[in-house]
Regions:
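Acyl-donor (CoA/ACP) binding surface of acyl/acetyltransferases
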Residues: 1-16, 25, 66-171
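An acidic, carboxylate-rich microenvironment
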Residues: 15-18, 42
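Conserved catalytic core of Hanks-type protein kinase domains
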Residues: 21-22
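Conserved GNAT-fold acetyl-CoA-binding loop/helix
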Residues: 27-49
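Short, hydrophobic secondary-structure boundary micro-motifs
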Residues: 30-32, 59, 162
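Sparse recognition of residues in long alpha-helices and their boundaries
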Residues: 35-36, 59, 67, 154
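A generic secondary-structure signal
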Residues: 49-50, 113
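A short helix-loop-beta-strand connector motif used in the catalytic cores of GNAT acetyltransferases and
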Residues: 50-63
Length: 171
């Protein structure tokens, strides 16, 4: 999957360090469901055992690659619901590459794959209200903000609202 200088590919054993750097970034934990760091052993097993098949694994994690095959980030499809043909999207891009269209291209590639090949009906994302960059990303990618969920994520000792974004495959 490629668009311009951005492509998506399955994780490789050589991606271990960069995957650990993203997955073990405590600043990102509050945006997801992680409750602690992954060990090298856990991540090695994930890379080795994942079939990188949404239907087999219940998730699809892809490496975002640009600039001479350098890993720029990770994009995930998870919380897959086969009955209702929908899944949640998550994306993280290296800080030095943010604001350069990398996330937009990666999201476009992922959507094309999910809608055209996998036949999903919809993708959705929960974005903290204060994460203006991510809200702009999903809006510009054609997602519709459907509402705000109050006190949806815990950050430290308080709770924050999130925006619920949805994109429907109009077959």
């Amino acid at each position: 999957m490629k668009q311009g200088n951005v492509s998506l590919r399955a994780p490789e054993p050589e991606d271990l360090e960069v995957m650990l750097s993203f997955e073990n970034d405590a600043a990102l934990w509050e945006l997801g469901m992680a409750t602690g760091p992954y060990s090298r052993y856990q991540m090695k097993r994930y890379i080795a055992e994942s079939q990188n098949d949404l239907y087999a694994d219940g998730q699809l994690r892809l490496m975002i690659v640009c600039e001479k095959q350098r890993v720029a980030g990770i994009v995930d499809v998870f919380s897959f619901d086969a009955r209702h043909n929908r899944a949640e999207v998550g994306i993280v891009v290296r800080k030095d590459l943010r604001g350069q269209g990398v996330a937009q291209a990666a999201l476009s590639l992922l959507e094309s794959h999910c809608f055209s090949l996998l036949g999903l009906r919809q993708l959705y994302a929960y974005v903290p209200v204060g994460n203006v960059a991510s809200r702009k990303l999903f809006t510009s990618a054609g997602y519709t903000e459907r509402g705000i969920l109050k006190d949806w994520i815990r950050v430290g000792t308080s709770y924050q609202d999130v925006c619920f974004f949805q994109k429907i495959n109009e077959l």
